[in-house]
């Protein structure tokens, strides 16, 4: 079976729709999917997409502005020990762009209301560090050669000042 290349962007927490799309196109192990950022926020299933992308060897991702906002907010969350600290300018910007559903899904995933606070605190700190490491591992662009053509895949544009 021939390898197919698919490119998508701005999933914004819509894991169910992503699954439906992949089923509809018959996405398989021979195919490759490039996600051009913004898997988080606005939709109900950001955590599901986050883990799905990491589990799949044939899915490649670059960071978008929502991942950048999330990373900045998570870095501040380590300082204030709060995912949605209103003291955080990065969080306020992230919140204006749909962060609350992501924060809610993180709290649900970490079972905030089901475990003792001390355990939740430790689990949250580990999770935040994991998210920061994941976002830091994402490139800002991907170069792809396909059918004798060279492509540069980006989220929203190229800044010549950023390597």
Locate the predicted segments by residue.
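Feature recognizes metal-dependent phosphohydrolase scaffolds
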Residues: 1-163
């Amino acid at each position: 079976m021939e390898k197919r290349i698919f490119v998508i962007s701005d999933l914004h927490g819509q894991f169910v729709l992503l699954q439906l799309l992949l089923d509809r196109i018959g996405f398989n192990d021979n195919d490759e999917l490039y996600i051009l950022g913004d898997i988080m926020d606005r939709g109900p299933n950001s955590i599901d997409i986050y883990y799905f992308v990491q589990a799949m060897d044939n899915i490649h991702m670059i960071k978008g502005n929502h991942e950048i906002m999330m990373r900045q907010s998570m870095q501040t969350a380590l300082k204030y020990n709060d995912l949605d600290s209103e003291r955080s300018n990065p969080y306020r910007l992230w919140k204006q762009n749909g962060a609350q559903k992501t924060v809610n899904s993180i709290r649900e995933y970490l079972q905030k209301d089901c475990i003792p606070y001390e355990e939740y605190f430790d689990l949250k700190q580990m999770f935040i560090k994991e998210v920061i490491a994941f976002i830091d591992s994402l490139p800002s662009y991907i170069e792809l050669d396909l059918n004798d053509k060279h492509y540069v895949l980006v989220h929203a544009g190229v800044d010549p000042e950023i390597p």
